[in-house]
């Protein structure tokens, strides 16, 4: 059963809130040893941040590697039920006997959908593509992305009641477009709850000196992932936003918000690795290209040190120890001017680049949307596992591999709570 709201109260069921890699892993580990699991995801599809990556560690695989296998496991497991476009409104009760109120937003497309795409073909209205961080537009009738699970289109609520919405309905040969779809509220009974709502990129506009949102060719590390992806806004071409020019000279600014008492006081763990990885994107796209990484300290824990050494051997990748003071734009060329003090030489540097990538930090989703129940947090709004368990990046900054590992352990804890 998927995306259905007729759920009977079940004693011993585990609720996983968040359908990213951590939530999916927790759900599968519990379900595959015989426990019933509900997955609740606020977006139209499962997959989370991993689905937005071009490649991920440790093997630099595309996200289709891990996600497709996990989606197949979910589809084949009768003990997993998922609810997309759904949020937790309220949690009552305690371990062993939770009553959870859910709200499901309308999708306006029912289970008859075959992903033929005729609704999108008929829709003339476009909206910003949030999957690509607004770097392009998509039709208001859309599949979230090519790997989306479930494979079902969505009609954006902004066009409901318009001619564009009616055109979508008229174009569908399977009677799958339901413009009368409504918000649904319902309750489920569960024995344990795992919060796995992940992270959000830190808002780069809060760092005024780095000029994100003011200088067009300054982007974030997650935007860089989408640029490099074959299903991204440029189909994987390394071009800059202002004019579509191929990028041959790029800079990466580390700790953009992280390790800063005015923003995120903690290290976000993956930012250095992400920038090292992204230098390979630009270098592979153009062997003549050059990349510079501005850093405070480079942190590559465990086996990732080997990857750092490999990147460092590339003569076209430079490393400058120093905190970037200012980023400006050359109005004539749209190039980006970076001002930084080189900590090792003591010299002030002003360098020109075609594009700059900010390594923005990880902010737990609970920094903005709290758990509507009895949850505990640390001083940075990460969830401390207690009555309500937590896993993945809502618990601490993590990479994909460690997120999967902690999710397995969390599944065991959830099972122990059920069996008390």
Residue ranges and their predicted role:
Residues 1-420:
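Residues forming the flavin
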């Amino acid at each position: 059963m998927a995306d259905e709201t007729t759920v009977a109260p079940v004693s011993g069921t585990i609720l996983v809130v968040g359908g990213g890699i951590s939530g999916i892993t927790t759900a599968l580990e519990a379900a595959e040893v015989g426990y019933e699991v509900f997955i609740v995801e606020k977006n139209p599809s499962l997959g989370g941040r991993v689905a937005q990556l071009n490649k991920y560690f440790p093997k630099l695989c595309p996200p289709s590697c891990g996600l497709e296998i996990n989606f197949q496991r979910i589809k084949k497991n009768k003990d997993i039920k998922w609810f997309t476009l759904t949020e937790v409104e309220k949690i009552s009760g305690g371990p062993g006997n939770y009553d959870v109120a859910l709200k499901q937003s309308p999708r306006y497309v029912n289970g008859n959908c075959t992903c033929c795409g005729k609704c999108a073909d008929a829709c003339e209205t476009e909206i910003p593509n949030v999957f690509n961080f607004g770097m392009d537009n998509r039709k208001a009738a859309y599949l979230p992305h090519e790997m989306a699970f479930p494979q079902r289109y969505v009609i954006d609520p902004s066009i409901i009641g318009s001619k564009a919405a009616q055109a979508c309905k008229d174009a569908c040969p399977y009677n799958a477009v339901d413009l009368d779809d409504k918000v649904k509220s319902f309750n489920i009974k569960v024995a344990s709850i795992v919060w796995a709502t992940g992270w959000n990129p830190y808002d780069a506009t809060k760092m005024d000196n780095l000029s994100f949102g003011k200088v067009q060719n300054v982007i974030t590390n997650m935007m860089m992932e989408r640029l490099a992806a074959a299903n991204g806004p440029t189909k994987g071409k390394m071009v800059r936003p202002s004019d579509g020019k191929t990028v041959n000279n790029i800079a990466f600014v580390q700790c953009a918000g992280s390790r800063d008492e005015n923003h995120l006081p903690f290290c976000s763990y993956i930012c250095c690795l992400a920038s090292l990885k992204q230098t390979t994107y630009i270098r592979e796209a153009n062997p003549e290209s050059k990349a510079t990484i501005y850093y405070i300290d480079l942190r590559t824990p465990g086996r990732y040190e080997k990857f750092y050494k490999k990147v460092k051997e590339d003569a076209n990748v430079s490393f400058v120890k120093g905190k970037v003071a200012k980023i400006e734009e050359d109005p004539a060329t749209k190039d980006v001017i970076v001002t930084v003090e080189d900590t090792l030489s003591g010299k002030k540097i002003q360098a020109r680049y075609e594009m700059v990538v900010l390594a923005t930090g990880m902010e737990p989703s609970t920094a903005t949307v709290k758990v509507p129940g009895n949850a505990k947090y640390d001083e940075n709004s990460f969830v401390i596992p207690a009555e309500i368990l937590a896993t993945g990046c809502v618990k601490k900054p993590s990479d994909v591999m460690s997120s999967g590992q902690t999710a397995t352990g969390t599944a065991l804890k959830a099972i122990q709570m059920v069996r008390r």
